[in-house]
A protein has these predicted regions:
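Short arginine-rich
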Residues: 77-81
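Anion-binding and metal-coordination hotspots
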Residues: 51, 59-72, 83-507
Length: 507
């Protein structure tokens, strides 16, 4: 009897095999190197199917588990036609063959699912979750700490240069004293110093009972500081402009505060920020970021969606972690409706006392003369405009100050200091917040919010609790992205099979 004769008609492997039969898999396998000696290679199409089915069936499957399943599991035997590749073979296939084509495979599988299931891509439910990286917990490197250490070394170099210049007065050589120094300059200074005193490193003394000469001490200090500066430059370069930390055992991982605090000390852990956009329970777009905040991940995710599908979703629905001025402006520029909550959304919509508080600056009336007035009728005049840090679109806050708060009967309710009250206002952002409230408080908005909590958060719930994928296994941003794509493909195929099974059962 054939293996398929032992399988149930609704077995996931049969659904998977029928589905993959409609996709041209050979085009992803063109880069496999040709070997003309040794044993015959395994069929790459069967290998690809086996890997994808493993992630569909298990959520995440290790290389050792793939090897074992091919020996004992009928489903894997059916796909591999009784062949049993080793875990090394699977590892080579995933890392060398699939690494460059995995995103295209994800897109083509999604395209077929979405056409079959008539998935609505105009409504995209967005959420992010931090997955702990495969890195040591106490392997952090902090960018600010590194910069402080570097400036302390700069001060030591300045002191050392002053001593050396005094020593080299008779030779006519003078080292330039600056506020900052490059490692290359220190190496040149060490060479000049060695040449001036004709230093022979083989004559250096070390250890107890030996006294170093002034020239040896200065020369060794120059070499030591140059090495230190090179180390600091490398650390700052690895961090980049957008990160404040990284792990020594996985340079791509950033230290973040994650919800699962199993250490019980509120400790930052190395992690990746995984973002998904879900449409009709399927992962339509997925991205891996090194940002700690979801706010910075919205635009890259939308651009990735556009690159994949050729348009932006009309209704991206997200929680309060995504509502920022930058993201709202991006939505306006690309014809996207604003359905992302902002930080104070819940308080604005549920606490009417706070929302209508007459002492909030946004509720101060503005007269026909354009002057803002407080409940006591005092005028507020513009003092200056201030650029908001980290803003991409030139956002400015207007700072107003009351003309005179002395003797005000509402002083205790209105202000906390003895000075005239100062308020900061961004009318454009306030108008955006009001638009978001109107969108999300409508009947359509309420349905979209409910669906987001079910679909987007539910996707991570299925990944972590039902399919036991709670931690990143690979290291390096490229390898992590490969892993997340495999998990996402497995999730979508798992969902597709369940829906097909429901239809077959109902029929």
């Amino acid at each position: 009897m054939l293996i398929q004769d032992y399988l149930d008609i609704c077995d996931p492997v049969l659904t998977f095999d029928r589905f993959m039969g409609g996709i041209e898999l050979e085009k992803y396998l063109k880069n496999i190197p040709q070997h003309y000696t040794g044993r015959l290679r395994y069929d790459p199409v069967s290998m690809l199917k086996t890997v994808l089915f493993g992630f569909m069936e298990n959520g995440y499957i290790s290389l050792r588990e793939l090897e074992d399943q091919c020996k004992v599991n009928l489903c894997f035997m059916y796909l591999m036609d009784h062949q049993t590749p080793s875990y090394r073979t699977f590892g080579y296939f995933i890392n060398e063959v699939l690494a460059d084509s995995i995103e295209e495979i994800f897109q083509d599988i999604n395209k077929k699912i979405f056409e079959t299931e008539h998935v609505d891509l105009q409504h995209l439910y967005i959420d992010g979750s931090k997955f702990e990286a495969n890195a040591n917990k106490y392997s952090w490197v902090w960018k600010k700490s590194t910069e402080k250490s570097r400036y302390r070394v700069f001060d030591k170099i300045t002191t050392l240069f002053a001593e050396i210049n005094e020593e080299l007065t008779c030779t006519g050589i003078k080292l330039c004293i600056n506020s900052e120094y490059a490692p290359e300059y220190l190496k040149e200074a060490a060479e000049q110093y060695a040449e001036a005193w004709q230093i022979d490193e083989t004559a250096f003394v070390h250890g107890r009972g030996h006294r170093k000469t002034t020239q040896q001490r200065h020369y060794e200090k120059l070499r030591e500081y140059a090495a230190k500066l090179e180390e600091y430059v490398e650390k700052i370069k690895i961090c980049g402009e957008d990160r404040n930390s990284y792990s020594k055992t996985d340079h791509s991982a950033t230290f973040m505060r994650i919800k699962t605090d199993y250490m019980g000390n509120d400790q930052l852990l190395p992690a990746y920020n995984v973002q998904v956009g879900v449409a009709d329970e399927y992962i339509a777009v997925v991205d891996v970021n090194q940002y700690r905040s979801d706010m910075d991940c919205f635009v890259p995710l939308m651009n990735k969606f556009y690159t994949t599908y050729g348009f932006y979703p009309k209704y991206p629905v997200a929680d309060a972690g995504y509502g920022s001025y930058n993201n709202y402006i991006f939505c306006e520029q690309h014809g996207i409706e604003k359905y992302m909550k902002f930080t104070m959304f819940k308080k604005e919509t549920t606490d009417m006392k706070y929302h209508k508080d007459p002492f909030r600056a946004v509720n101060f009336p503005i007269g026909e003369d354009g002057i803002m007035r407080c409940p006591n009728g005092k005028n507020f005049y513009l003092q200056y405009r201030k650029n908001v840090k980290g803003n991409k679109y030139g956002r400015q806050e207007e700072v107003y100050q009351c003309e005179d708060c002395s003797g005000c009967p509402y002083a205790e309710q209105c202000k906390k200091t003895d000075k005239n009250r100062t308020v900061r206002i961004n009318r454009e952002l306030t108008a955006m917040h009001q638009e978001v409230i109107e969108n999300l408080e409508s009947i359509q908005g309420a349905l979209l919010r409910m669906n987001r909590s079910i679909q987007a958060e539910g996707t991570f719930g299925i990944m972590k609790n039902d399919r036991w994928y709670k931690r990143i296994v690979r290291r390096g941003i490229k390898s992590v992205l490969l892993e997340v794509f495999l998990v996402s493909i497995g999730h979508n195929l798992y969902k597709y099979h369940n829906k097909q099974k429901k239809v077959a059962t109902a029929a």
